[in-house]
Amino acid sequence: MPHQQILMLFGLLPVATNISTWWNFGSMLLACLTLQLLTGFFLAVHYTANINLAFSSIIHITRDVPYGWMMQNLHAIGASMFFICIYIHIARGLYYGSYLNKETWLSGTTLLIMLMATAFFGYVLPWGQMSFWAATVITNLLTAIPYLGSTMTTWLWGGFAINDPTLTRFFALHFILPFGIISLSSLHILLLHEEGSSNPLGTNSDIDKIPFHPYQTYKDMLMLTIMTIMLLTIVSFFPDIFNDPDNFSKANPLVTPQHIKPEWYFLFAYGILRSIPNKLGGALALTMSIMILLTMPFTHTSKLRSMMFRPLMQLTFWTFTATFLVISWTATKPVEPPFTTISQVAALMYFLFFISNPIMGWLENKIMKL
């Protein structure tokens, strides 16, 4: 039977014996994507993409639709879970040198960009006060592009300001992009299995492999169970933990919130954007904060793949992790000293991690006489 052959192939998939829990986040991302698609579909059925009705339709979903509150909370908190998993997944890739599998890394970075775009469009849909102003600030960055900026912004907005056409096209984009994410995820997994996963030691795993089932399937199920428990606990007891209080008010173009900030998972990029006092410079830094990941496979000079045996690079990596958290924290603060100085130093250190990668590799080769 064909399905038995598929199961057999899945069961016989060879996996390195020593891959740790950090390798489980890929399957967790797949679970998050499935959850977002299902809950998103049921929300789209009841949502109305109109500036006069969008906010009311969200209230209608949470109050009147059976289990609508659960769908809405699962979708919103599921997005946060998605980003927690993807940031850990990327950190694992950076630490253990998974980026040397070039095609997988480049498709993964493209997936991250698509995911961030989808999440941004989704944040605008409730048409709350913070949704509206976050959309205004971010789409306005297009005007920084020389010559084409103003035309592109007007084209994106569908008018001379953010209005009904903007919301309609953002809903359309939020609906269509996940299908692109599914396609690219399939390609990402396909490219990964061309070469197979790396392992914590960064060595060739061919000499010591085990079948995927039952070992990795049970390991995946354990992590998925832990994630599900966390998700349901937050949905049941702290549903508004990630929400902005301003977003409980309907969008008002005449009143600017005291402090405009995006969802927590965009804070690091927003912090880098704000740290540069020039509009075009900030927009470029924002773009580069993600695009710089693409440089990693091409700047790896060390003879060792994993950071497990690279103490200098370990120090650099954990400094980078702390920097990521510091930028996210400063992005929640007002634009005034000392926060501006801290965010500028942190943004510089963020980019220094990627710039120092080839230097550190060369230095470690020299020290270890490799």
From Swiss-Prot:
Function: Component of the ubiquinol-cytochrome c reductase complex (complex III or cytochrome b-c1 complex) that is part of the mitochondrial respiratory chain. The b-c1 complex mediates electron transfer from ubiquinol to cytochrome c. Contributes to the generation of a proton gradient across the mitochondrial membrane that is then used for ATP synthesis.
Cofactor remark from the record: Binds 2 heme b groups non-covalently.
Name of the molecule in the record: Cytochrome b
Species this chain originates from: Chilabothrus striatus
Family membership: Belongs to the cytochrome b family.
Any one Gene Ontology BP term: mitochondrial electron transport, ubiquinol to cytochrome c
Stretches that traverse the bilayer: 25-45, 69-90, 105-125, 170-190, 218-238, 280-300, 312-332, 339-358
Keyword Electron transport: yes
Cofactor(s) in the UniProt record: heme b
Gene Ontology cellular component terms for the protein in this record: mitochondrial inner membrane; respiratory chain complex III
Topology of this chain in the membrane: Multi-pass membrane protein
Binding site for a ubiquinone: 193
Binding site for heme b b566: 89, 188
UniProt KW keywords: Electron transport, Heme, Iron, Membrane, Metal-binding, Mitochondrion, Mitochondrion inner membrane, Respiratory chain, Transmembrane, Transmembrane helix, Transport, Ubiquinone
Residues bound to heme b b562: 75, 174
SUPFAM superfamilies tied to this protein: a domain/subunit of cytochrome bc1 complex (Ubiquinol-cytochrome c reductase), Transmembrane di-heme cytochromes
